[in-house]
Amino acid sequence: AAPIWQDFSFTGLYGENYAHPVNMDDNNQQTTATVEYTAKLKYGDFFGFADRAHNDFENSTYFELSPRLSLSAVTGTKLEAGPIKDILIAGTWEANSSNYPGADFNNYLYGIGFDLAIPYFQYAQLNFYKADNEKGTTDDYQMTAAYGIPVKLGSEDFLIDGFLDWSTGENATHASELNWTTQWKWNVGKHISPDTRLYVGVEHSVWNNKYAIKGLDQNDVSALIKY
């Protein structure tokens, strides 16, 4: 069946404060090209993206594919309570390919998700996962929140959207991670035509214990263009 709606986008990013395990510092330059696809389906939704990144130490391709199955749609019963709009079975496949030794992996996450109704939010999701990580990497648990907030100032349209990932620390070599990434974007495309979405802005990334490495912390602001 055709999607109820779908969206495809391309994003370019450039920042100078990316953290990397080679030097355990966050003063590394990185350029990233991202393609994203999201769709609302009859029985759930789908989100996927791929990053092609180049920094001082490596070239890498990272992607995530995240299908979710709506229990409301499957059962024909609205599963709503308070701010919860729907309950979903959630899954994610994370994969990385890099010329940096030991950086390739495939992780498989599965769990339960919630769609939330929050005033002023275009969308809000909360997912809880068990992560089966690459062999040699400790399995853990993860919480992922995703959100989008449209803002209108005068005749100008802005969008604040992003995600927050928090994962558990399992042992001395696998620290608890927190990755909070938000994009602050202005739609300059509406000045080209009413239906054109061309965003410029910044992406702010706060990533504590990046890659589950204790003390590898990132606080980066990247220039952004998205179409």
Protein language model annotation of sequence segments:
Residues N127-R197, V206-N208:
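Outer-membrane beta-barrel transmembrane domain signature
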Residues D26-Q30, E58-Y62, G82-I84, A103-N107, ...:
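Transmembrane beta-barrel outer-membrane domains
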Residues T38-K40, R68-S70, G113-A117, A146-P150, ...:
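Transmembrane beta-barrel domains of outer membrane proteins
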Residues A2-A53:
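Short glycine/proline- and aromatic-enriched beta-strand/turn motifs that initiate or cap beta-hairpins
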Residues A2-Q6, Y43-F47, L71-L88, A117-A124, ...:
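Short loop/turn motifs that connect adjacent beta-strands in outer-membrane beta-barrel proteins
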Residues D217-Y227:
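Outer-membrane beta-barrel "beta-signal"
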Residues G12-Y18, R52-D56, G91-N99, F128-E134, ...:
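Transmembrane beta-strands of outer-membrane beta-barrel pores
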Residues G48-G102, E177:
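Surface-exposed loop and membrane-interface regions of Gram-negative outer-membrane beta-barrel proteins
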